[in-house]
Amino acid sequence: MENMNDKWKKIALEAVPFLLLWAAFFVFGLWLRRQIPLDVPPGELHGLDYNGHGELFADHRLITFTRFRHPLFGWLMSPIPLFGARIANVSFIAYWGYLSFIFSGIVAASVWMVYRISAQMEGVGKVSAAVCAGLFACFGYVRYLAAGPESFSVSMLLALAVLWWGVRSPFVVGRQPLQGKGVYDKLVWFLLFVVATGITLTQGAKVVLAYLVSRRMTKRDWICLASGAAAAVLAAVGFYVVKLMLLGSGGRTVSSAFADLFSCIPHDLTIVQRLRMLEMFFFEPIVPHGVPYSVSEIVVAYSSWWQYALCAAIYLATAVGAYRMRSTLLVKMIVVMFCVDAVIHLVMFWGMSEAQIYCGHWFYVLPILIAGAWKKGVIKKPSDML
């Protein structure tokens, strides 16, 4: 009984910084709620443009939370929706300021966590660990500016939760299950599931899949089987979502809706144009959500050869690190969830923007995998690194 009390006391002490951080967000949200001009039309940007895509930004980024991805997203993003405020009426500057406040706190903690993880890997010195943490900060910053105030704060919160859980639990980073199968691990899994589900239902499904893989399916054959099964299920869900988006309340049939969707895809393309589309699909970093890829604009595109070279170098280092760490459960879960993301984006006609390992939901694994390229990723002390 005494040990259980000590465990709960430890959990409570570790949760205090996160609770204080959320309390700060809550108070700031109360203040910001008083600054919202409620007479502004939804999506109005007050004449501000966003990299030449102000119309897209107004329609996509500042729309009401209930129409964006998942209703829980609004609750996780800020306390504003709890007080009946319409996020569509938040001015661009006020909304950006709020996310900047979240960014400054969470990214600092996340970068520190990345440094501690990398520094504990065999063969990775403190300087190299600092480089990995710097890479994390750079990519997080790029994601923040490139994608705009969409889901960065919650993605950072999810990244921090994964890192915190991964560091504290020897089950994730170790080769075999060790300790930590009790209440503590279950609690962190549950919190991670809540946060992920708040982003999208598919993110929550991927957390459940990762839990099953890490607990029961440790062989590579089972990994492939789980990836295929999950991809099939999520593909079906994806088509169902597309159907709902297209049908709406107009009473159209499913066949006519899909006919309209596929009619948007150009078929009279040359070989060069098809190769260009393939290149854009896999290598352009940002594609607007909810818009068929074949008819959407690219918000961020590479303009110089060295940017593509840097991208290729990062891909190579990440692949080498993943291969060298292929026996760890962490990499196995990443592979499974990456496969699921790829299927989702293929089905939904989005680019591979979030499915790419260096962007979106995946950028936080970069420093760990790149560190693994230096030395095979074996954590010395997976527990008690905080």
Short names for language-model regions:
Residues 101-122, 317-321:
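Transmembrane-helix motifs of polytopic, lipid-linked glycan transferases
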Residues 179-216:
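Membrane-interface alpha helices of multi-pass inner-membrane proteins
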Residues 28-56, 64-80:
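Extracytoplasmic catalytic/substrate-binding loops of multi-pass membrane glycan-assembly enzymes
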Residues 113, 288-293, 304-328:
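Hydrophobic, aromatic-rich transmembrane alpha-helices
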Residues 24-30, 224-310:
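Membrane-lumen/periplasm interface segments of specific transmembrane helices
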Residues 154-174, 185, 365-369:
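Specific aromatic-rich, kink-prone transmembrane helix
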Residues 114-138, 332:
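Transmembrane-helix signature of polytopic, membrane-embedded enzymes
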Residues 144-152:
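Short acidic/glycine- and proline-prone juxtamembrane loop motifs at membrane-interface regions
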